[in-house]
Structures are given as C-alpha cells and as structure tokens.
C-alpha cells in the first residue's frame, strides 16, 4: 500500500488545479424527495454510463490523496475524527446561487444523501470574491430535484467577510441537515453561524439568535424589489461525510455491493466473506506446538498455501467509467494446498487444526482445509455514484495474510 500511495501521489498531483474546495446519521422520518433510500437496480445492466469528461471537485482528489498517503496533518481539526468514523464523503456542487440584497438562496440536489446512513458532518463551502463588502446576510438552503418542487431545508445568518484571509469560507450545516433527517421538516431556528477560513478549518460554533415563527416562502422572495444577481455554482459546494449503518447481512458492509451491482459482473450467491479469525492465546500454546511438531505433515505434492499477486484493472472489468482512482491495484489472493496436519505457520483456528488431525487418521471423514485470507485490509476509492463523486472506504479489499481454515 505504501508504494501504491507514492505512485498515486504523483499521478494525482499532476491533475489537481486550483485551490481545494473543501457527518452521526439516523433514519429519517420523512426523507428528502428523490433521496436514495435503498439501491435500485438500473434497467440497463451496465447502469448509466458516465462521461469520461465528467467534472469532479479538486478537493475530493486532495482528500483521496491525503487518505492514501496517511498524511493526517493535511486534515482539519474537525475533519480528522470525522474521517475516522466515516466511510463515504460526498461533494455536491450547487445547482443555483441567487443573491437578492442581503439574502442568498442556494440550491443543491441532495438525493444522494441517503437516510439509511449516519450523517457525520455537513459543511457548506463558498468561495467569495475578494472585493465582497462586509455585511450580515441570510443564507437559505434548498433541496432541488429536476421535475419536483424545491424543498426548503432551513436558513441561517452570517457575515462571510468577518473571517479575513482565504476567499474560501466554511459553514457547518450538520445540525440543519440532521434536523431535517430526524424531524422531516425545515430547520426554523434562525441561527448565526460563524464563518471560518479554509486554511483555519477549525471547528465552527453556532450561536443561537432566536426562533422564527414562519418559514420563508419561495426561492426568490424579494419584498423590496432589489435586483437579483448570481455567482458561479462551482464556487458553492456542500461536502457531506457519512457512514453506512451496520446490517444483518453476512456479507458485511453493503457499500461495495451497491457499487458493483450495476456492473457487468454480479457477485455470486456462493460468495462467502472470510473474517479475520484469531486464535486465542493460552498457556497450552507450548504443548500445542510440541504436538504439532511431533506429527509430521504429509506431503501434498503441491505448493503450500501462500499469498500471490492479483492485479485488478477496473478498465478491463468495465468499471473504468465509474472508478476515478485507483484505476488498478493489487488485491492479492490465496492459493496452494494445506498440509496435514496444520501447524502455526498457516494460522489455523482451533477447529481447523482439530479437523486436520481427524483428516490425518481418517481420510474419508472430512475434507481438506482451504487456503483462504485470514487478514485483510481496506481500500479507499474515489468513484462516481448517482452522478456525484464520492470517496468511499471499503473494508476487506486487500489480502494481507493467507492461512488454512
């Protein structure tokens, strides 16, 4: 992984341009309209083909690079613990940005924010012009979906010019989104959210200013007929950190399954997830070792269980349009025969060792143990999901050690 990280660093570094743009989630009572409440298989077995030229925020590439290289110092005070708890990061570019006087109306398609996940952190990141004058503004947040009415999520007050320095400003919207996911209604508490510069990235705090009796109506409500203006949507990004809720499935986290179901290749029903089994330490370890060593292992006439290379090239398995990075990686695999009886070299469970002894004295009674992964590590992937770029952390993707079980 270390060498892979170094290689990816130079590949990624050459593609990053401009300044980077830089969530506990519970089940929603009333989800967002059009939200992803569960994976639905597309009619086309390939899913929706994604354009090779689809844009993705440079910040997502930078975050992926930081994760691969393990450079925790590049993370903010708030991002560091959140990343440890999250397995997906979603970056949503605004659909529209309308400014009417001191009122900003920002719209995002939040369909990708699934109520089946835990919301860990939500940050609104805005790049303001350097000449922006200092004034208090009211920011309204809407969920918008093509062909549907805009849904008001909530609003807050702030003065974006207070934090001098970086043109990128950060606002913590975690509470607003969590409130909607919990209550199924707009966040009507008008609060003052302190702005932070991108380079500070310290944890912003919220100062309550009071409760508004009525929710503002309309995307472009303008009582004083102040001329409306707008600024580029790519300067407004909503970054959401999430975590999949545990399921009862023996396959473990469903995130990877959701990703691959739209591929040409579908996971077999016979696929079995091998978990990391650990043999408990006990005082009889010396005795067990003596027993194992005094019974000679039979020659199986084959190469013994070991780890070998297995290069996964996403282009060759037709995932190239979906995976941004890495385009290929070494997942490794286990192959070879298991000796009879087993010894500590092959990291057997107690059951596997006993079974190998039974096999030694009664060939027909049990089958041979299999060479399988006994220790695995995760892989972070930058990929397209529902038209958005997502950073996902998939467990059990790379074989670290093989053994007989």
Curated annotation (Swiss-Prot):
Keyword annotations from UniProtKB, A to Z: Cleavage on pair of basic residues, Developmental protein, Disulfide bond, Glycoprotein, Growth factor, Secreted, Signal
Location in the cell: Secreted
Annotated propeptide span(s): 19-282
Induction of the gene: By dorsal mesoderm-inducing signals including activin and other nodal-related proteins.
A single GO molecular function term of this UniProt record: cytokine activity
Outcome, altering residue 334 to S: Fails to induce mesoderm
Glycan-bearing residues: 71, 172, 343
A single Gene Ontology CC term: extracellular space
Keyword Disulfide bond: yes
Signal peptide: 1-18
Cystine bridges: 305-371, 334-402, 338-404
Tissue: First localized to the vegetal region of the blastula. Just prior to gastrulation (stage 10), this expression disappears and instead becomes localized to the dorsal marginal zone, with enrichment in the organizer.
Function description: Cooperation and regulatory loops of multiple nodals are essential for mesendoderm patterning in early embryos. Essential for mesoderm formation and axial patterning during embryonic development. Activates the activin-like signaling pathway to induce dorsal and ventral mesoderm in animal cap ectoderm. In addition, also dorsalizes ventral marginal zone (VMZ) tissues during gastrulation. Induces muscle actin. Appears to act as both a short-range and long-range morphogen. The unprocessed protein inhibits bmp- and wnt-signaling.
Subunit structure: Homodimer; disulfide-linked. Forms heterodimers with the TGF-beta family member derriere. Interacts with tsku; enhances nodal2 activity.
Record's comment describing the protein's domains: The pro-region is necessary but not sufficient for wnt-inhibitory activity. The central region is required for muscle induction activity.
Family under the similarity heading: Belongs to the TGF-beta family.
Protein name per the record: Nodal homolog 2-A
Native source organism of the sequence: Xenopus laevis (African clawed frog)
Gene for this chain: nodal2-a
């Amino acid at each position: 992984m270390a060498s892979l990280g170094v290689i990816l660093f130079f590949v990624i570094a050459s593609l990053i341009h401009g300044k980077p743009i830089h969530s506990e989630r519970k089940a929603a009572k009333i989800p967002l309209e059009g939200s992803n409440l569960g994976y639905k298989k597309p009619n086309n077995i390939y899913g929706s083909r994604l354009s090779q030229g689809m844009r993705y925020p440079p910040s997502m590439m930078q975050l992926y690079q930081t994760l691969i290289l393990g450079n925790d110092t590049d993370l903010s005070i708030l991002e560091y613990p959140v990343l440890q708890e999250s397995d997906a990061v979603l970056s949503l570019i605004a659909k529209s940005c309308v400014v009417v006087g001191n009122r900003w109306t920002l719209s995002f398609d939040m369909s990708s924010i699934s109520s089946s996940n835990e919301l860990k952190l939500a940050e609104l990141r805005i790049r303001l012009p350097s000449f922006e004058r200092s004034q208090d503004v009211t920011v309204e947040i809407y969920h918008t979906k093509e062909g549907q009415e805009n849904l008001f999520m909530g609003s807050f007050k702030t003065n974006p010019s207070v934090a001098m320095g970086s043109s990128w400003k950060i606002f913590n919207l975690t509470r607003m989104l969590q409130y909607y996911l919990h209550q199924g209604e707009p966040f009507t508490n008008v609060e003052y959210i302190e702005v932070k510069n991108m380079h500070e990235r310290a944890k912003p705090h919220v100062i309550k200013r009071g409760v508004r009796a009525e929710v503002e109506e309309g995307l472009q409500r303008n009582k004083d007929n102040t001329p409306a203006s707008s600024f580029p949507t790519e300067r407004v990004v909503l970054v959401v950190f999430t975590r999949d809720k545990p399921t009862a499935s023996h396959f473990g986290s469903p995130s990877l399954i959701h990703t691959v179901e739209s591929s040409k290749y579908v996971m077999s029903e016979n696929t079995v997830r091998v978990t990391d089994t650990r043999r408990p330490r006990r005082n009889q370890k010396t005795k067990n070792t003596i027993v194992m060593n005094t019974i000679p292992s039979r020659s199986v006439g084959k190469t013994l269980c070991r780890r070998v290379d297995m290069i996964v090239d996403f282009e060759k398995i037709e995932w190239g349009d979906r995976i941004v990075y890495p385009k290929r990686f070494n997942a490794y695999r286990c192959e070879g025969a298991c000796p009879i009886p087993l010894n500590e070299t092959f990291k057997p469970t107690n059951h596997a060792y006993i079974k190998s002894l039974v096999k030694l004295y009664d060939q027909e009674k049990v089958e041979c143990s299999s060479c399988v992964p006994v220790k695995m590590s995760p892989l972070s992937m930058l990929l397209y999901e529902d038209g958005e770029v997502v950073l996902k952390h998939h467990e059990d993707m790379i074989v670290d050690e093989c053994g007989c079980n």
